[in-house]
Amino acid sequence: MNKQVSYYCYGISFIDMAMLTAAQIKQMEDGDYIVYKRQKIKRQKGVKPISIKITPAIRQLIGSLQAASPTVDDFLLPIVTRSGYTGERLYMHIRARYSKYQKYLRLLAEELGIDFHLTSYVSRHTAAMTLQRNNIPREVISQMLGHADLETTNIYLDSFDNEVINEAAKVL
């Protein structure tokens, strides 16, 4: 289910999902939003927060995850499972959870007969490509992915075109 959260939340990374807190839910005129800065770049100058409207699908997914496994401290999702962890200890805990998540994705791919390397990052790629295929401007996709500049998004999305070409070539 974390994979679905990642997809519906614009391809949010595992570390960003893990670090989300209830305090990052903001009420705005047109509904509730998750507002956060990517862990990867949050300390860089001029980084804008990403705002994700909480749709009924997102609300249901979060509710299902919280019902299945209790959250600790102020974390929004039950990825962090130990209370009171901070700093290096928290980082190592999240890394261990990430490794377990990746392992289960590999097992799921095997069970379903999926013939490519299924990772947590696939949901980010899938979200970006779905947006591009639906003619969403790259400037908007860039903002949704939290990229610092449009060039990063262009490189990111153009690399997918090569992946599609390579997959198509296998059919020949």
Regions found by a protein language model. Give the residues of each.
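Residue-level marker of regulatory loop/turn positions in helix-turn-helix DNA-binding domains and
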Residues: S6, R97, S120-Y121, L157
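Short, polar N-cap/turn motifs at the start of nucleic acid-interacting alpha helices
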Residues: Q24-D32, I114-F116, I136-I155
